[in-house]
Amino acid sequence: MECDAVIYNITENVQQVEEALWAVSALNEEISHFEKRKVFILLSTVMTWARSKPLDPDDNEVPFTEEDYRRRKHHPNFLDHINAEKIVLKFGKNAKKFATYVVASGLQYGAEGGILHTFFKMAWLGEVPALPVFGDGTNCIPAIHVVDLAGVIQNIIDHVPKLHYLVAVDEAVHTLEDLVKCISKNTGPGKIQKVPKENAFLTKDLTQEYLDHLLVNLRMEALFVKENFNIRWVAQTGFVENINSILKEYKQSRGLLPIKICILGPPAVGKSSISEELAKYYKLHHIKMKDVIAEAIAKLEAIVAPKDSVEGEEEGEEEEEEENVDDAQELLDGIKESMEQNAGRLEDQYIIRFVKEKLKSMPCRNQGFILDGFPKTYDQAKDLFNQEEEEEEEEIRGKIFPYDKLITPEFVCGLDASDEFLKERVMNLPESVVAGTHYSQDRFLRSLSHYRDINTDDETVFNYFDELEIHPIHIDVGKLEDAQNRLAIKQLIKEIGKPRNYGLTDEEKAEEEKKAAEERLAKEAAQTAELEHKEAMEMAEKIARWEEWNKRLEEVKREERELLEVQSVPLRNYLMTYVMPTLMQGLNECCKVRPEDPVDFLAEYLFKNNPEMQ
């Protein structure tokens, strides 16, 4: 209630309608307590005009303006929106105390992309050969940049105009086909494909509300805004005319800036393996010279291959195609001649041309790239990255010369290792890997020697990047003692930073979760097996100790028995010599006499017949 201006946006979330109506009602009830005028602005949508009848039945191109708002007919799915508009306008009758406004906004673009984000994302990812246009694509869509829309709202607050219903659209008249084609051309595959409207429901990011906005056919003109407001327009001429700045906003807002990396170093140092891992981590395009050349030649051959003429082709298109065929054939002939004269190797001028074309391709411009092992020399780097329109051939060293920022790497990594380390690494490679590659002994040593030779002068490829103040990250792979290059990759990721893309797709997330679950189950199974093994080992050890204890106990008992036997020998001898003869005689005599008290008789007998007393 303390705010002088209250703005409710019901274009993005229909749930805001109820809250907006509550707010305007509550403010209206407090009019008598207002010390100064308050302004309430309802940001609505041109979809409340979607079913309006043409102003001129004979001319459908006559646009609607603010003055026609009483004739507007809403789209069936936007009943809540038009009801909200009517209620807000009804509460603004006491404009000196409480002024209410409704702004019918066109399809909003800019910043993160808005409703058009689905097409931006498809184009940026490059996963489809053509962007879809739902229906025939001829429907006109009123639109406005979000910053310009903010300017309209700011002017309403500043000027409090007498007109309470305003239209906010730019001056362009664009169809759905115009918008999609523009996105495809400037950040996508460059092609569009018209598909049935029903196919839109197969695109998960498109809601019914978004689809309604994309399929509306309406011509509108913000006449009052144009004549009465002072707005610093960002995109007054519309989406297509301002696509470059809109794309820049979109990429910056969503953090979709390309990562451009160059990995250099001697043969067998691990350039390709590290590049491959970084390409997977950052979702970049791995640029290998062999693949680039093969792809470029294949494209040229496809152009010059005979094609069946397509009916309906315009004369201008046919002439342009013929010129392309002639140019492609001329280039192919030059490549063939170059390879014949250079023992199967291609001259730098062709390699640089193909690499430059690849780096300027839309996928590389969107996501970025990793240049694997190229350029090798200062001159190659200069020819590849310098601006083509150089003023002078000779550049002053130490001065930053013009270079193509679109394709010049942002990060340069120089891998290195001692010759002994590299030779040993190649020697340890399996024969199946070495066969037919540049890792064979003669070719490898020649390549290594050539690399050392071209990197001893002051004009090395690393000097080129230093002059551009793109200072290479130098890593001595030999000192890391890591055959898998994990430490080098970890160091590079730390230097480069986080990925700049949309992150994992739903499929990749599911795969990651599945992989994590499998790893967790495997870990749990390993822990269970380890625990069971440990318990079994402890039990076996316990049984072994028990058996050992019993064995020792039996041994002790045996030793005790033997000791007792040894100790009892003198006693037995004594008994047999001195006691038993007399005792036996006494027992025999007792048996003969059979006295009443045998014990007393025996004692008396032994006493009388004791040999020591006789």
UniProtKB/Swiss-Prot annotation:
Localization (cell): Cytoplasm, Cytosol; Cell projection, Cilium, Flagellum
Annotated Acidic residues bias: 311-327
Biological processes per GO annotation: axoneme assembly; brain development; epithelial cilium movement involved in extracellular fluid movement; establishment of localization in cell; inflammatory response to antigenic stimulus; spermatogenesis
Matches recorded under InterPro entries: Adenylat/UMP-CMP_kin, DD_AK7, Dpy-30_motif, NAD(P)-bd_dom_sf, P-loop_NTPase
Enzyme category, top tier: transferase
Keyword entries, A-Z: ATP-binding, Cell projection, Cilium, Cilium biogenesis/degradation, Coiled coil, Cytoplasm, Flagellum, Kinase, Nucleotide-binding, Transferase
Amino acids binding AMP: 323-346, 373-376, 380, 446
Protein name per Swiss-Prot or TrEMBL: Adenylate kinase 7
The organism of origin for this protein: Mus musculus (Mouse)
